[in-house]
Amino acid sequence: MAAAFDPSGRLPDLFTSAGTSSFSAFLSMAAPELLPGRRPLPPGTAADLTPHATTIVAIAAAGGVVMAGDRRATMGNLIAQRDIEKVYPADAYSLVGMAGAAGIGIELIRLFQVELEHYEKIEGAMLSLDGKANRLAAMVRGNLGAAMQGLAVVPMFAGFDLAANDPVKAGRIFSFDVTGGPYEETGYDAVGSGSLFAKSALKKRFRVGLSVDDAMRLAVEALYDAADDDTATGGPDLTRRIYPVVMTVTAEGTHRLTEAETAAIAENVVAGRMENPGG
């Protein structure tokens, strides 16, 4: 139940009492209508009313994880946006990407970022990587009603595990289903409409112990292959200079490649495909 309005201007007791370290749990008591998936929807499907985002790939490398996403959003058979961003830092040592209903997905990611920051401020420490994945799973589960009407969001989460015994193997990847089930993946994963083709490419080229640089190129290669067969996935657009978003997370934290760095990788991939279209 939402907090009652006080005509005196005082904050409701809910805002001044000791509460939970979960911001989304607080919001569910203070203003539940603001949570993704909590707004009432009319009967029927709404899948064609919003842009949908795909495809995201993640690759475990020596000492971290690489996550990359294409830039295309579609509405049915139309390209709704050519330069949407689908990969973001969740906090200092983790990344999150999303596929599905773009508006809800971006809102979910922003709420997740606030959730992790709120926990750290209240508890004075970071959540464990498993704890972060479980918090994200709960948020995805909260959107199940909207997902049943076509507005599904499926995130991908990856991070550097500060508690790992071996820093070289500290990069971990988590996938989720539409009901919020979290699953840890080994080596690599992909999500979105082009994920079938991206994972097929990763399966052939992935090797345990890849360097971060090699994993970045492999991620762009996988997105190129996905775009080659999936109309909802956009490949490197050399004409408009629109390239995939590529991010890394290592012991030094998260890092987003600059446009120039991503352009260099994408142009090398395209040049290689000119000589060998099949990769």
Curated annotation (Swiss-Prot):
Protein name as annotated: Proteasome subunit beta
Keyword Repressor: no
Enzyme class name: hydrolase
Prosegment location in residue numbers: 1-53
Superkingdom classification of source: Bacteria
Keywords: Autocatalytic cleavage, Cytoplasm, Hydrolase, Protease, Proteasome, Threonine protease, Zymogen
Cross-referenced SUPFAM superfamilies: N-terminal nucleophile aminohydrolases (Ntn hydrolases)
